[in-house]
């Protein structure tokens, strides 16, 4: 017996949009990249078909000796200050992103950080945080238990940058994460 089967589908209005951009970039002003933060946002805003840029400079740039405590996550005064001492470098970078967001309704500028562990198996981009977590912070830097320290903050978003094991699983900071 032979039967002919016809398969079809209909896609209605999705209500969703596709956006293009970069979620992992560095500057020379705050990390080991090139140019200033303003240069990066200006370039991305002028580039064709770029909807957003999230700059994620290395976390160790913001570290100070006093930032290795749990309270430093909320108390930005412990973070590295700008040259004129008026705000922390973290606050300055976040304000620069806000400035570029106010300039356009067609482009999103955001600032996060790349959690950078010395000698660790991976780095992670971290977004939507009030402050930064020091790689020297034993209380928040719990890498062996599924980011137990950073999970205390419900609104943050983390993605693994570097490190895959032989099974293709992300190995970020010693934590294996299955891709779903």
Where are these predicted regions, by residue range?
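Extracytoplasmic/surface-exposed domains of secreted proteins
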Residues: 1-2
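Extracytoplasmic/periplasmic beta-strand context in beta-sandwich domains
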Residues: 5-7
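Extended, charged catalytic domains and RNA/DNA-binding interfaces, predominantly
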Residues: 10-180
């Amino acid at each position: 017996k032979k039967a002919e089967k016809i398969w079809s589908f209909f896609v209605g209005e999705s209500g969703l949009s596709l956006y293009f951009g970069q979620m992992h970039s560095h500057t020379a002003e705050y990390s080991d990249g090139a140019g200033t933060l303003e240069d990066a946002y200006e370039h991305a805003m002028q580039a064709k078909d770029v909807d957003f840029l999230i700059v994620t400079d290395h976390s160790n740039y913001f570290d100070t000796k006093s930032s290795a405590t749990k309270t430093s996550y909320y108390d930005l005064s412990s973070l590295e200050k700008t040259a004129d001492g008026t705000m922390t470098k973290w606050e300055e970078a976040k304000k620069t992103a806000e400035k570029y967001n106010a300039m356009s309704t067609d482009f999103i500028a955001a600032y996060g950080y790349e959690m950078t562990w010395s000698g660790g198996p991976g780095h992670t981009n971290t977004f939507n945080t009030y402050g930064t977590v020091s790689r020297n912070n034993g209380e928040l830097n719990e890498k062996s238990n599924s980011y137990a320290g950073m999970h205390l903050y419900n609104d943050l978003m983390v993605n693994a940058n570097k490190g895959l094991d032989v099974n293709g699983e992300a190995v970020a900071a010693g934590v294996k994460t299955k891709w779903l």
